[in-house]
Amino acid sequence: MKTKLSFIAILLLITMLLGSCTNTPDLPENTEPPTSDNSTDTSTETPEDPFGLLRSSEEEWISYGLAAYENDKEVENLKDFFSDRANMTYLTLYDHFFTYDKTKSVPVAEALFAFIYDKYGAEAVLDLVKRCEYKSEYLKSLGLEVEYTNAPEVEVFLASMDFSSNSTYKYIISFGNVTYYFKDFSAGSPTQYHGFLYYSTTGLFEMIDYLKSNNLNEGLDIERKFNYYMTFDGSGYNKTVYANGNMYINDSNSTLHEAVHAMGITKNDNIWLSEGICNYFGKQLGFNDQIAASYMQLLTMAKQGYFDEQANAGNAQYILYKRVYEDYTTRGGKIDSVDTFDFRLYTDAHARVELDANTYRTLGEVYKLVNKTDCNAVGNELSYDQATSLVLYLVDNYGIEKVLEAYRSQDIETVFGKGYQDLKTDWLAYLYN
């Protein structure tokens, strides 16, 4: 019996000892158990990618810069390159530059990327708002006392472009539903079109917002795609194919005019009305600042005598420029800024000078040149500026809603209470008052 009790006692002792080895003592609430100093970490967590933010960027220059940086490629010192001010254009680094001149663009991309990343970090590389500032700082780091002069709003907008290329169009540049097709940049560089792309596109967006917010878009497809084919064939004429809305552009000031045609102003029975409406929205309301700037440049050149020699030799075009300047400024027109430029005064001056000189190309003549067929529409004897001046007169006296109603119905007399000839007589009386 004694042996049996001893055996049981031994078993109880072993059980107690084993329990003390395997059970964790009770710990205070919310307290983690201690870990052994000799425990082994078996985690397989992947280290964070320092360039993760940048890999998702669709900007081409960032891709080139990142690839060089990851491969520890030594960047070029571009002080001599940028000492030539003509090369400042390469610092824009918009996507189409890598098609235009990859050899010069890639080293710039690599150097700028390394400068911004090293000094400001990954987020700064993507910061469009401060990018102009960073580019100026980069130039200073080269020992150059020069600022990067691109306007921040232009920089941000053009950096948002979608770019592609094909065998027909070397440069296809899109901003949302607006696309420009260039076979080439004619004799110039991409930079000369940056202002055009910015002001033309933002002006179109502003014009559409204006139509929509003022309930003037009845019958107009303001949500359509706008495709501009930049033909530059030397004719100076623009054309919108009414069947599909594609626009063929020779004059950069006419993109908004043609967009109004593409949206639905296509009836030509009263050609003066359709063309006048397109110019009213596309030019007169000032959505594209470059149009005012181009007119002001002509007036300033006339003021400074640049056209005197040609005008004195009998060149009709230069005589017209000088007379428009005299008419516009005599009636109080200003040419000191786009904000004070008076489109209405300028258009009326242009119409008067044309009528007085009796030297202008009519709507009918232009229609025949573009469409290869005669035009017998009402108002085809007017010029574009004369038709626009007439529409402006009607807007002042009847309102734009009535003008659009007349276009939609093509019933001029019912809408205005007068026919075309009577309205034209009233307009001429106003013009020469």
What residues fall within each predicted segment?
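Solvent-exposed, acidic/flexible segments
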Residues: 56-64, 102-110, 118, 122, ...
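Positively charged n-region of N-terminal signal peptides that target proteins for export
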Residues: 1-7
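Sec-exported extracytoplasmic/periplasmic mature domains
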Residues: 52-55, 71-76, 114-122, 130-134, ...
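Active-site-proximal alpha-helical
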Residues: 66, 70-71, 84-137, 307-421
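C-terminal motif of bacterial Sec signal peptides marking the signal peptidase cleavage site
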Residues: 18-20
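Juxtacatalytic substrate-recognition/specificity segment
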Residues: 43-59, 174-270
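Beta/coil-rich, acidic/histidine-enriched accessory regions frequently appended to metallopeptidases
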Residues: 22-27, 33, 37, 41-46, ...
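Zinc-dependent metallopeptidase catalytic helix centered on the HExxH motif
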Residues: 43-80, 240-347
